[in-house]
């Protein structure tokens, strides 16, 4: 199985600042069609997970342009600019290159007081 690693379990950030959340894969997620099959999700408090980014860098419908995804075949970054209170929650990356589809353990974004 492909192992997805998110090293940072918690990421404290000040409102209004930018933050980067990282993720890496044990195998390249660049498929033969030239697309990179990595998703980013946000699970807010008492909410279901919501898709933010697919194909590594494409924002899902309705997602703010404050969110951007980038990376290579194995190393990925979700950048959030001008962090707001509504951005708090657990961010997960997911690979879709091969079954079983696997997720990282998640990175919890918390606002500093």
Swiss-Prot record:
<dbReference type="InterPro" id="IPR050150">
    <property type="entry name" value="IgV_Light_Chain"/>
</dbReference>
<dbReference type="GO" id="GO:0019814">
    <property type="term" value="C:immunoglobulin complex"/>
</dbReference>
<feature type="region of interest" description="Complementarity-determining-1">
    <location>
        <begin position="24"/>
        <end position="39"/>
    </location>
</feature>
<dbReference type="InterPro" id="IPR036179">
    <property type="entry name" value="Ig-like_dom_sf"/>
</dbReference>
<dbReference type="InterPro" id="IPR003599">
    <property type="entry name" value="Ig_sub"/>
</dbReference>
<keyword id="KW-1015">Disulfide bond</keyword>
<dbReference type="InterPro" id="IPR013106">
    <property type="entry name" value="Ig_V-set"/>
</dbReference>
<dbReference type="GO" id="GO:0002250">
    <property type="term" value="P:adaptive immune response"/>
</dbReference>
<keyword id="KW-1280">Immunoglobulin</keyword>
<feature type="region of interest" description="Framework-3">
    <location>
        <begin position="62"/>
        <end position="93"/>
    </location>
</feature>
<dbReference type="InterPro" id="IPR013783">
    <property type="entry name" value="Ig-like_fold"/>
</dbReference>
<feature type="region of interest" description="Complementarity-determining-3">
    <location>
        <begin position="94"/>
        <end position="102"/>
    </location>
</feature>
<dbReference type="InterPro" id="IPR007110">
    <property type="entry name" value="Ig-like_dom"/>
</dbReference>
<feature type="region of interest" description="Framework-2">
    <location>
        <begin position="40"/>
        <end position="54"/>
    </location>
</feature>
<keyword id="KW-1064">Adaptive immunity</keyword>
<keyword id="KW-0391">Immunity</keyword>
<feature type="region of interest" description="Framework-4">
    <location>
        <begin position="103"/>
        <end position="112"/>
    </location>
</feature>
<feature type="region of interest" description="Framework-1">
    <location>
        <begin position="1"/>
        <end position="23"/>
    </location>
</feature>
<dbReference type="Pfam" id="PF07686">
    <property type="entry name" value="V-set"/>
</dbReference>
<feature type="region of interest" description="Complementarity-determining-2">
    <location>
        <begin position="55"/>
        <end position="61"/>
    </location>
</feature>
<protein>
    <recommendedName>
        <fullName>Ig kappa chain V-II region MOPC 511</fullName>
    </recommendedName>
</protein>
<feature type="disulfide bond">
    <location>
        <begin position="23"/>
        <end position="93"/>
    </location>
</feature>
